[in-house]
Every structure is written in C-alpha cells, then in structure tokens.
C-alpha cells in the first residue's frame, strides 16, 4: 500500500502531454496553449478616451472657461483636427484622443453653449486625466499569454485582440468509462431489493466532462471475467479507461485479475486513503487505466485525486493541484484509522476567515452527502485527533462548487 502523494507522483509521471494541434479560436475554450502568445500591437493602439466628454488642453482649463468646439469624434473614427489653445473636441468613450489634447473632461462637468459650438468647463482638470495611453496595457511584442495557459473567456478575448483566429493547443485525451457489478442495473429500470442503479458511470462522465469533451460511457458489465475482458478491450482504444467496482478483495472482484490477464502493467493497487483504499492504476502501451472503488463517494474522491490531475497533465496544464482553503474546524472529529481521509464538508466564510464542518454521512456509499458538500476536508495520516477550533485544510473541486 502506498501513500496518496506517492500514488499521484506515479500517475503524473506516466501521464504524458498529448501532441499539439491547431484549432479555431472559437473552439479553444477549456484547452491549454501549446505556445506562448505575443501581442502584435500596442494596447490600447492609440491614446483612447476613457469617458464621454471633451478633449482639451489642460493648461486652458479653469472653472467656467469657455472653449470653441472644433469637431465631434466617435469611436472608430480618426480625428481630423488638432486641438489648439482655447479649443476642444467633443469625444466619445473609446475614441481616439486628437493631437494637441492632453486631457478629457467628463461630459457631466461641462455645459454646452451656442448649439454645441462652444462648451463651458465647470471643473479644473489635470494633464492626462481620462485618457488611456497608447500601450499602457500591453506593449507590442510582449508575451500576453504563456505556454500552458488555460483558455477561458478572458483569454479568448485577448487572443482575438492580438489577431489570433486560430491557436495551437494540446490535444485532449479520450476517456472511456465502465461500471462493473452484478448488482447494477440500468438507470431506466427499477432495481430489485438486492440491486442498485448504475449511477457511477454518469457521475464519472460528468466529472470528466468538466475538463474534456471526448467522454464515452462504454457500458455496464456483470462480475464475469469474459464480459469484463471484452469491454476492457473495447475501452483500451481510449487514451484513458476508467472502471468502477470490482477492485476489492471479494470473491467476485475480478477487475484486477482481468487487467493482469490482458497484459496491463499495474503500478499500484492499494492507496493509504479513506475512502478509496482499493484504487488500481496501470498501463497497457500508452493507454492509462484507472480501476476505482465502486462505492460512489470513493469513486468521486479517487477521480478527483488521481484521474483529474492526470487529464490536466495530458492537456498541458502547468498546475494540477486543487485549491486548498485553510479553515477553522467547528466540531471535533474522531479519527479511526491512520490513513489520509477526504471527507465531504461544508465551508462557510465568517468575517475574513473560513469555518468548516463535516457533512453527516453514512460511509462511502452515501452519494447524497456529496450534494450537500462544497469541499473535501483533509485529515492527515499523521494526525491523532482534531478538536473544535483547530485549523484544517479543505480541498476545493469544481465538481462540488
């Protein structure tokens, strides 16, 4: 049995970045850049008005001064006239500040006169006010997005602003999902008293689809070697194959045996973890196989701890870790076993800090506990007891937020 940290190191060592590919900008969201991106222009590309108002020479401005309005400038048009002493140009937000002007007076601090041929300035203004200077955001040639950056809405906007209608990103892995167990029935069927619906396939697919799109539920299979073997062989066409169930020590836990029969190299099959001890990771060729415990909370936790970081590594992410919040424990926790625990928990902000309490649960089969949680409280294997008021770590995950 190995530690959580050592298991994750093995997984990340074996998960390799996928080759880069070029995609259209509109299809890049959620992917990671394979190359750094430099700006091909200054941003803003010109001295830009930050307000609706009047472009003026600051030295002219004193309360109640009257200026001649020489033109009106709107966004998308080039000024035709230079502002001289005693003059002003009416200007709109986003428009080019005309030559000669060194400040913009807000429209609410002015009074138009003589049918907009003149303007009275009601307030003194300093040089440079309400002007976004050329290149103050980004200079031409500057790296605006680094290699490994995840493309979100804001990065998409930057890519468009620097003229990229296509970008080079890392490919995403294909993911196949298999659930095993005689007790499982299709979710459209009403289970008999000794059966349960196959929820794991769908929750795993939902977790995977938060970061990749090529996710396929390959099916449910009984505790039968030949059936398991056949479906695993189909699943090995995927970059990552995830199985749930059939990995404990029971007479009908057959997944590990079938994987070995198929020539899968197993790197670990037990992790010092609760829930999720019987977690298996292996490879056949360049295909990665995760065989996760069948209890729903165990399945959820082990996906977050091992599968998600692996997917991120393959996609070119530079960071694979979940965010950690330090919070004050509201109630004492009894620690039963010397294994690291990840327990469904509820975080709440109080003042400038956080407080956390465990969600009541009935063990790793209690899927409903996850619906009430917004984090996983981490109980270190080195801790003997946790008292109310102790500071603890809580792992955040997109799947719970």
Q: Model-derived features: where do they sit?
A:
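Flexible glycine/proline-rich
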Residues: 2, 21-26, 30, 34-35, ...
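Intrinsically disordered, low-complexity, positively charged segments
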Residues: 2-64, 151
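Helix-rich terminal scaffold detector
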Residues: 4, 165-292, 296-302
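Generic secondary-structure signature for well-ordered alpha-helical cores
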Residues: 9-20, 34, 38, 136, ...
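Short beta-strand/loop turn elements enriched in aromatics
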Residues: 23-25, 46-67, 103-116, 347-370, ...
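Short glycine-rich, flexible loops that bind phosphorylated cofactors or substrates
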Residues: 98, 153, 249-251, 298, ...
